[in-house]
Amino acid sequence: AMGKPMGTYVTLEAPALIEPDEDYHREVSEELAKQLRNLIPDIEKEQSILVVGLGNRDVTADALGPEVVDNLFINRHVIKEYGKAAYGCEKMHMISSIVPGVMAMTGMETAEIVKGVVEQTKPDALVVVDALAARSTKRLNRTIQVSDAGIHPGSGVGNHRNAINKESLGIPVIAIGVPTVVDAATIVGDAIESMIQESGEEGYFFNREHPKALSELNNMYVTSKDIDETVKRLSFTLSLIHISEPTRPY
């Protein structure tokens, strides 16, 4: 009914996510870790997990995926060389990562690159991080969406690419996304919506296709003025999920 693939979809509403409150962001990281552990099969067992940072690091609003990967604790190479004893642990997930870039840079579909890496490194699960397009200005930089249904890179801004999901890769794919841009038509629609809320037609624009006059704005995407700081802050929040520690209480 929603036009989405079947799966589990979780939205973490975090209104203060745009604020530089370290304690708040730590709580969000811990809750996100809980949700990941619920979605990744057999997470209590040691696994090899590949984290994919989707997006273009040269476009600030689209750099969330690459920024998260930059901040991750990567250990696959060390464990394969020296074993878990290098970290003083008896039990530990192996974490690897890749930033496949965008087709304009590589000439390849993101799904092709990821599939090649999966075939060579054989991870048990895939975690994909991407910036999303918001359906409401109230969600901009304020929600974290998690799903086990995979992801279609670029679909939020109309660039439809091959899907990255369990069907195409053969392993569980968990997608994490934060809306960092919103199209101009949505901004106008939200503004009009707020003006007619008392008229008894609340939800008029949200529940319908945009009128023709607004549809001309659909190719224009807007982000917040402090998006560089916001993306950097969000990247730390998403990277502190402690996914490498299977014995962690959450």
At which residue positions do the language-model features occur?
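Short glycine-rich or small-residue beta-strand-to-loop segments that form or flank ligand, phosphate
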Residues: 11-15, 48-58, 97-101
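Extended, charged alpha/beta regions that create polyanion-binding interfaces
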Residues: 1-46
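Long, charge-rich alpha-helical interaction segments
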Residues: 191-224
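Single conserved hydrophobic/aromatic residue that forms the stacking wall/gate
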Residues: 241-250
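Glycine-rich phosphate-binding loop
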Residues: 111-162
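Gly/Ser/Thr-rich active-site loops/lids in small-molecule metabolic enzymes
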Residues: 70-76, 143-169, 197-206
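Glycine-rich phosphate/diphosphate-binding loop of Rossmann-like nucleotide-binding domains
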Residues: 56-93, 97
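A structural-propensity feature for long, helix-poor, extended segments
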Residues: 86-117
